[in-house]
């Protein structure tokens, strides 16, 4: 489900910087020969990738979830079936009979049934079996939102934020997003948490947002699971039982396919953040993220191959992942020195492997 509140984008980096200062430093333990630093928000050309000493290690740069604003969330858990007279229309909608669903829902929508109004809004907003009509979709979402339908309040809030089919209205959008979040809509909970962080700088906003991130995370939103993991790891004054769950929440987000969570989980496992070190599993998660196209993970994976952390040393694989990350703009002087020091045939093999690479 898309989350396009562009109003929040300008707050992203500032909010991330706030989080970095929200809690005590997390000392990242060094691996025997190397340490993987936490991903940051700096441009690729300044991404720190050379070896670090214990004094160089810095805390996490914060909830990278803010980089995801405007991106697509993972699929939500199945919605509960509508109850009452709209069931038949919703059943037709689920089977792909959109015109039938429209015909059956419209009379109920005209009589003020919020569930039917939401269904009409969904059909019109996506152009399912009918011509896409954002303006009329906004009308029906608005009616359903007035009637208290949580899904409609969320959709209508997004439209108000973007001025899509309805004039922009920040105050009204925030109000409906809050109401949808309080009603338990998981995507609204995530968005309302984002708004709270943006509108309340510092630790105050993070603590206000945390309960909504937690509720959304419990319902399967990977972005929220990632946020919970980072906040549990960095916020001060949280109960120890929550801090102990930070890695588990990161793992949930990683298992849901969130590549940034896969990257961070790999780093946490290698560095022993939130639990014992596990070089093999850390390697596996970084490789998964790297195969998915995450450039920072490709860079870190190259370091693991160079230093034989969680895997056997493999100069060709190390060079391949370095070539891929360098092509994406992530400079790394240490890996460049390594690359220039291997044999010509190894360089050639690495380039050929990089050329054949396809994201999985």
Positions of PLM-derived features:
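Hydrophobic face of amphipathic alpha-helices that form TPR/SEL1-like repeat modules
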Residues: 85-92, 119-126, 157-162, 191-198, ...
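N-terminal leader/linker segments that initiate helical-solenoid repeat arrays
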Residues: 27-104, 110-111, 115-118
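Alpha-solenoid helical repeat scaffolds
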Residues: 103-106, 142, 178, 214, ...
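Structural signature of tandem alpha-helical TPR/SEL1-like repeats
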Residues: 95-100, 131-140, 167-176, 201-212, ...
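TPR/TPR-like alpha-solenoid signature
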Residues: 86, 118, 139, 154, ...
